[in-house]
Amino acid sequence: MGKRDRADRDKKKSRKRHYEDEEDDEEDAPGNDPQEAVPSAAGKQVDESGTKVDEYGAKDYRLQMPLKDDHTSRPLWVAPDGHIFLEAFSPVYKYAQDFLVAIAESVCRPTHVHEYKLTAYSLYAAVSVGLQTSDITEYLRKLSKTGVPDGIMQFIKLCTVSYGKVKLVLKHNRYFVESSHPDVIQHLLQDPVIRECRLRNSEGEATELITETFTSKSAISKTAESSGGPSTSRVTDPQGKSDIPMDLFDFYEQMDKDEEEEEETQTVSFEVKQEMIEELQKRCIHLEYPLLAEYDFRNDSVNPDINIDLKPTAVLRPYQEKSLRKMFGNGRARSGVIVLPCGAGKSLVGVTAACTVRKRCLVLGNSAVSVEQWKAQFKMWSTIDDSQICRFTSDAKDKPIGCSVAISTYSMLGHTTKRSWEAERVMEWLKTQEWGLMILDEVHTIPAKMFRRVLTIVQAHCKLGLTATLVREDDKIVDLNFLIGPKLYEANWMELQNNGYIAKVQCAEVWCPMSPEFYREYVAIKTKKRILLYTMNPNKFRACQFLIKFHERRNDKIIVFADNVFALKEYAIRLNKPYIYGPTSQGERMQILQNFKHNPKINTIFISKVGDTSFDLPEANVLIQISSHGGSRRQEAQRLGRVLRAKKGMVAEEYNAFFYSLVSQDTQEMAYSTKRQRFLVDQGYSFKVITKLAGMEEEDLAFSTKEEQQQLLQKVLAATDLDAEEEVVAGEFGSRSSQASRRFGTMSSMSGADDTVYMEYHSSRSKAPSKHVHPLFKRFRK
């Protein structure tokens, strides 16, 4: 008996741990398929075996990292474990940061010192935008305060020696394997599988190698001018020149010259069979030469150009230009992911990419609201005619005839069950089109199975992923490198905030003490109803009501988020505010959102988790969170993004947006809250802890008497376990919803007292396996 109890306890603990760190879609995360082809070098890690560790676990790097004489003038520390630390107060910070964003993953970026980490995937992304192995090692040596450890040099060479050397280019609708290294092409052609993929002429002989020469600009962007930072001349003025070592000074002077000069590149290529592209890509990955996908859209004469251009009023911000420069080079488009904060203008980046390629474009979002907003963005920023935009959702199915830009959702394309006749016709049309560009919005949310389904259903030459939070709790996000492409650019949240491109947000965690009656029940109950008890805590309700009243007096626009539908309805109905959740119709949603934007009498709305992503509400400047999804870092960042859009007439020095997370004290919610804040803290945000809201006692608030609190408690206790569960959003991939759920019930439930209906289903006999049934009995059943 003891063993069984212990096993049950272990099972419960594992479930609890899983819930704390889970994401909405982590079960079917990218890379769960063991057949996914990934270069073996991608799994390599920096070797730390030579590092001494003292009795407290601290690492001693003194012997491996001798300081240079002029170390105070250099901005980087490169540790033997692959972590790089950057001084944000260095005079050459702008240049060093641009270089580190290209070669490493950001770990933490507070005010004064930033932390990055070298990974195989980040180095793969670096070579994909044109950096060579020698460039990376040379720049690191020059910028580092110490000698760069040999292990780091070996790791960089291992990961970059073959990456980025070979490209798959589509020219005149013919596929070519291209490289600027003739020896690599010869090495690939010695492989029998690749020789089989090579195109042959009518006599059965392999086509000749093609040698081309073209001019291109340096892959390193001139960060200073593009990011609003100091130019080289300003950094190297007479006063500052003494602070910068001569080799760094000469290096940046040379870097500016390289930026202005065009360099000549000679490439060797051979044509391959179109039907064997997938096999070719897998074989090249196996040979440690992964193919970088590039689309020569200017020379694509088969697919017609579409009539689209940016309006003169569309002015790109410096960081948006920089991200697009990483995507477009030498007149070609690279596939990859661009990471920008919520509210920083990801949609404009997508529209500009479509205007640059000027081929048929397919945009995929994660909700019907997202589809409507993308259509509005295309009409706002580009010259495209309304008749050329086609929407494909469950509510809106525009006729695709003469369409240049199609906008749909992942669930519509990945739908596997029977469709209506009209939807089937649109799907057939989507499949037959050859798309120049596919824009994947909120790219972090899609599981691998859905990716493969979407990517095999529609054919696109170039794929651009857009997201604000390239994080997942299961660390499978890195597999997007080979599903879409490498990370092309990632912006610094704090820099954008300081430059006024996004709002300056005051983040606060408000601690709400549990009322004695609620806490007594919370300790006693072990079911999911505990979630309802700390969400419906009367003191949390009062804090929420006080904050709404306070900010409505300031004419602020307030969004209140709740993952739990029971709590959402109770709060909204009690406070007489409009609310949006899963079953709310599309028409009602748009009406509520339009009123919130333009009606001065509607200043507060309540939204469930359907509003986590793709809700464009630039007017909102206050967000209150009353319940959330476990310890999800991504959800916290996405919700902060609802108030991140730059405000009109804002002063950069003052806080102009507020993010409140209401937490019931001494409950599991406090542990979840700490975990949720990790991503935002890593971006440089700080959370202020408020234990008492000043002026709350003077306000006339609900649940101020024991009787009212007792009535609320009885209502919560009368709720079912189903009410304690989070909302399941329709079309949400990888959610753990199923058709059946196990929960405690009562006999009154069986008779329909709480709107529950007891039903039994019997599977059809015709569907039962009958291969082992004797033929004689089969005849009797007919």
UniProtKB/Swiss-Prot annotation:
Motif DEVH box positions after renumbering to this chain: 441-444
GO biological process, one term: apoptotic process
Biased composition (Polar residues): 218-236
EC number per UniProt: 5.6.2.4
Regulation: Phosphorylation on Ser-751 by CK2 controls the 5'-excision activity of ERCC1-XPF endonuclease; phosphorylated protein inhibits the excision activity and thus NER. ATPase activity is stimulated by TFIIH subunit p52 (GTF2H4). DNA translocase activity by this subunit in TFIIH is stimulated by XPA, ERCC5/XPG and XFP plus ERCC1.
GO cellular component, one term: nucleotide-excision repair factor 3 complex
Keywords per UniProt: ATP-binding, DNA damage, DNA repair, DNA-binding, Helicase, Hydrolase, Isomerase, Nucleotide-binding, Nucleus, Phosphoprotein, Transcription, Transcription regulation
Record-level Gene Ontology MF annotations: 3'-5' DNA helicase activity; ATP binding; ATP hydrolysis activity; DNA binding
Biased amino acid composition, Basic and acidic residues: 1-11
Motif Nuclear localization signal per record, residues: 6-18
Cellular compartments annotated: Nucleus
Function (record text): ATP-dependent 3'-5' DNA helicase/translocase; binds dsDNA rather than ssDNA, unzipping it in a translocase rather than classical helicase activity. Component of the general transcription and DNA repair factor IIH (TFIIH) core complex. When complexed to CDK-activating kinase (CAK), involved in RNA transcription by RNA polymerase II. The ATPase activity of XPB/ERCC3, but not its helicase activity, is required for DNA opening; it may wrap around the damaged DNA wedging it open, causing localized melting and twisting that allows XPD/ERCC2 helicase to anchor.
Subunit structure: Component of the 7-subunit TFIIH core complex composed of XPB/ERCC3, XPD/ERCC2, GTF2H1, GTF2H2, GTF2H3, GTF2H4 and GTF2H5, which is active in NER. The core complex associates with the 3-subunit CDK-activating kinase (CAK) module composed of CCNH/cyclin H, CDK7 and MNAT1 to form the 10-subunit holoenzyme (holo-TFIIH) active in transcription. Interacts with PUF60. Interacts with ATF7IP. Interacts with KAT2A; leading to KAT2A recruitment to promoters and acetylation of histones.
This protein's name: General transcription and DNA repair factor IIH helicase/translocase subunit XPB
Origin species: Pongo abelii
GN (gene name): ERCC3
